[in-house]
Amino acid sequence: LGDGRAAALTADCSACTGLCCVLLPYRRDQGFGADKPGQVPCLNLLGDDRCGIHADLVEKGWSGCATFECFGAGQHLTAVTYGGRSWREVEDLGEMAAVLSAQRLLHEMLLHLEEGDRRSPDPAAAALAEQLWTLRDAGPLELLTADLDELHETCGELLGAASLRVRGPGRPDHSRADLAGADLREADLHGAGLRGALLIGADLSGVDLGPADLLGADLRGADLRGTVLDDALFLTGPQLAAA
């Protein structure tokens, strides 16, 4: 993954116009300090589209903001999809919100496909990635009419195949298992399949999770002290931030 593509898949709030703070809804029980419907500016958003409490989000009860990641979709939506226009200049914020969700999904798929290609190259995965890189530069209408469900399903299958190649045969499979609150300190999870596993509050301290597949695993409140994650597959910043 070249420097340009790596940067494209990393959020740069300074190049955005606070889109997630306006377009997306949030609730108190999801780690936000208030309830807000979509397409309404956050009460902490300043006139320059910066956050007024960014340095103290967690302390002030806004941990949901600290763990949210758009994977670079926000700045791309601002600069390319809407040609530099901010949400203040767009008439249909509902459409813009839907486009942001589409772009975020594209960017997240690309992030994982690029990792899969880096760890275990596959022509089919590379071809899908190029298709998605092209689609992300499309206009709002094309993005909203694209069959993202089919693309997401194909992406999931290719990532699953890459995961098996990297992890090797015979490793434990706990995909989508409910392991919330479990004491997993003695479990053999090296190279395990933990895709979509519920690991809320689980004790993973000191566990070797390389190269375990953590795609979509819920790590909220998990104890990761001393956990070996260097080689883990498909682990994102928001997952770590939620632990």
List the predicted regions and their residue ranges.
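Hydrophobic scaffolds flanking metal-cofactor catalytic centers in soluble metalloenzymes
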Residues: 1-120, 127-143, 147, 151-154, ...
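Amphipathic alpha-helical surface "interface" segments used
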Residues: 125-135, 174-183
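Tandem repeat scaffolds
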Residues: 160, 164-243
